[in-house]
Amino acid sequence: MHAGLEHIRDWFKGELLFHEPLARHVSLKVGGPVDLLATPDSREELQQLVTLLDQQQIPRFVLGGGFNLLPSDVGYRGCAISLKQINRLQLDDTVVAIEAGASNQSLARAVAELGLSGIEFLIGIPGSVGGAVRMNAGAHGSDIFSVVKTVTLLDQGQFRELPREQLTYGYRCFEIPDNSVIVAVTLQLSEDSLQAVRSRMEEQLGLRWATQNVKFPNAGSFFKNPPGESAWRLIDQAGLRGFSIGNAQVSEVHTNFLINRGNATAADFRALAAAVKERVKATCGIELEEEVQLLDSGECGQ
């Protein structure tokens, strides 16, 4: 463990968990111990923590909700940062300011009860708002950047609020400076009737359960959809429905979901993902790209 991590307990007010198994915090239920999992109580404590880690060149990453992450079996030599306490919501007419640690589903429900429309699809996407922004999360033709107005980053020790015009984003991606942290986002929503918003949310949940009723631990869609294609269809065409390596398996319900059948390892999932990519390339001539972030044993970044 990095020596500098021990001294954080001298001033840090939030929760600190040393040698914490990542498997407890990742939806795939895999991953070895991280040296330190820190949960700052405020933006200011986050700023102080990130500054110290960077000064001492200690690797770090933002855990988010753990729903789009595949760590290593050996764990992570550095600091994982949870933003779950940085989750405030503020409303100004139809503009919603929400911090990165809030959950997507709680945000979707909160604005729906206010008769605000534009992010109904988030009800079916587990994880945190920061994670949703980082990957430009979306479903059924909608994505979060369709309503993003500004994004606040912690970059080189300073908070920066960037307007939409200065942001670069695309399908399942949002480009941010290396080692910066998404802290908050403002969303431009629109007014609608409470009944209409609730109805669309129920429709989104219905679509999710009809197509993605996967009962085993998973990370959601594992691969991005190639242009004009669906990853699940390509995987199915390659004959991989139900294919497994160790206890990691291609779901028989939705083939773009890789599931943990019980006691799977991160190595099982990495081997399975590699096998899927190889078979799809050989069968369909298309190179799949992971939507899930593969976390090595000590790398910096969100």
Curated annotation (Swiss-Prot):
One cellular component term from this protein's GO annotations in UniProt: cytosol
Say yes or no: keyword Nucleus present: no
| The EC number(s) this enzyme carries | 1.3.1.98
Obligatory cofactor(s): FAD
- Its predominant location is cytoplasm
Q: Which UniProt keywords apply?
A: Cell cycle, Cell division, Cell shape, Cell wall biogenesis/degradation, Cytoplasm, FAD, Flavoprotein, NADP, Oxidoreductase, Peptidoglycan synthesis
Which InterPro entries does the UniProt entry name for this protein?
A: FAD-bd_PCMH (IPR016166), FAD-bd_PCMH-like_sf (IPR036318), FAD-bd_PCMH_sub1 (IPR016167), FAD-bd_PCMH_sub2 (IPR016169), MurB (IPR003170), MurB_C (IPR011601), MurB_C_sf (IPR036635), Oxid_FAD_bind_N (IPR006094)
Instruction: Specify the FAD-binding PCMH-type domain's residue ranges.
Output: 29-192
One Gene Ontology BP term is: regulation of cell shape
Q: Which reaction does it catalyse?
A: UDP-N-acetyl-alpha-D-muramate + NADP(+) = UDP-N-acetyl-3-O-(1-carboxyvinyl)-alpha-D-glucosamine + NADPH + H(+)
Q: Which residues form the active site?
A: R172, S221 (proton donor), E291
| PROSITE patterns in UniProt | FAD_PCMH
**Cell membrane among keywords:** no
Pathway annotation: Cell wall biogenesis; peptidoglycan biosynthesis
From the Swiss-Prot or TrEMBL record, state where the protein is found.
Cytoplasm
Gene Ontology molecular functions: FAD binding; UDP-N-acetylmuramate dehydrogenase activity
Summarizing the function annotation, the protein's role is: Cell wall formation.
What protein family is recorded? Belongs to the MurB family.
Q: What is this protein called?
A: UDP-N-acetylenolpyruvoylglucosamine reductase
